[in-house]
Regions:
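Hydrophobic alpha-helical transmembrane segments corresponding to the first two to three helices
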Residues: 2-115
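Generic detector of multi-pass transmembrane helix bundles and their immediately adjacent loops
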Residues: 76-302, 306, 311
């Protein structure tokens, strides 16, 4: 490479150093928020996202250091290239897997997954890892494959997000039907979080797809005039990606919510038959001491009238 190219790559290196600093600061905040300030509200998803932030910071740091070695003749080039490829592959795998988890509502509207969903996520994780690993080995040949993989992850994320929104809407409708207003508000908050995630994930993936597509065009038809376009494209793409991903992380961070926010939604939501049945004038139930009890009391007249509920003194 010419000296002019190396000077421009040095500018890209400064951009990567800046992004690495941003992810390091964000990761420090995430560490305190997850393990200190809101430890009771954190989940496995928040811990996985912290690992992703560490990998993103390392990837940008190693990339910046690699560009400073231009024209890439030093002995450290091989080790820096290996570090960049490894951190890039792991960070992409963890990043897109976490986005799929959020799209399924894990860590936001529920804290469990079905066996079928776990199998789907493991398959997506393996395919993502293998795809980006191959892309690092032959980026000029396998670029279209990586671009297709990214488009597939984009479609899966939007599909799962819409599906999760629909399930939460059905849950809210069921609460309204059975007149349980205490659970409507926290469930509606979950819907808002997933809904905002939908409108943040969409531009995030579009920016990634546009950035990778532009890089593919420049790599295949490279000339002197296109080098400046590569520089500006990397600058704009990197900044937009950092802003959108940071907004997604800020949206789903661990925080204090409603006391009912930890309740998972059920796919087959069935309420007690006693809610629909006619109760007698008295109903008794022996309850062990210090056992938590949830009681929903209807009107004292009408269909459910004459209900008397007693509690043990202990």
């Amino acid at each position: 490479m010419s000296a002019g190219h190396c000077d421009r790559l040095l500018d890209i290196a400064y951009l990567n150093f800046g992004l690495s600093t941003f992810w390091t600061i964000f990761g420090g905040y995430w560490l305190l928020n997850t393990w200190w300030w809101h430890q009771r509200n954190s989940s496995a998803l928040h811990k996985a996202l912290f690992a992703m932030l560490v990998l993103r910071a390392l990837c940008d740091l190693f990339t910046g250091l690699l560009f400073t070695t231009c024209p890439f003749t030093g002995g450290s080039v091989m080790y820096l290239t290996l570090a960049v490829n490894t951190s890039f592959t792991l960070s992409c795998t963890l990043q897109y897997t976490c986005l799929l988890l959020i799209a399924k509502g894990f860590g936001v509207s529920r804290h469990t997954l079905e066996r079928r969903e776990i199998s789907e996520l493991v398959t997506a994780l393996v395919v993502t890892y293998l795809g980006f690993s191959a892309y690092n080995l032959q980026p000029t040949v396998l670029g279209p494959m990586a671009l297709g993989l990214l488009c597939g992850l984009f479609c899966l994320t939007l599909f799962y997000t819409v599906k999760t929104l629909r399930k939460i809407e059905l849950q809210i409708a069921s609460y309204r039907q059975h007149d349980i207003p205490q659970l409507i508000v926290p469930t509606a908050l979950k819907w808002q979080v997933v809904h905002k995630f939908y409108y943040l994930a969409m531009p995030f993936f579009l920016v990634k797809i546009a950035h990778m597509s532009a890089s593919e065009v420049i790599v295949k038809w490279f000339n002197e005039a296109m080098f400046d376009w590569y520089l500006w494209g990397d600058l704009v793409g990197g900044v937009l990606e950092a802003v959108l991903l940071g907004a997604i992380l800020a949206l789903i961070r661990a925080r204090e919510l409603s006391p009912y926010s930890s309740l998972d939604y059920s796919h087959d939501l069935v309420f007690s038959p006693m809610v629909k049945g006619l109760l007698g004038s008295k109903a008794s139930k022996r309850i062990p001491p210090k056992t938590p009890v949830v009681v929903v009391i209807g009107p004292l007249t009408g269909l459910y009238g004459g209900v008397e509920i007693g509690f043990p003194e202990q």
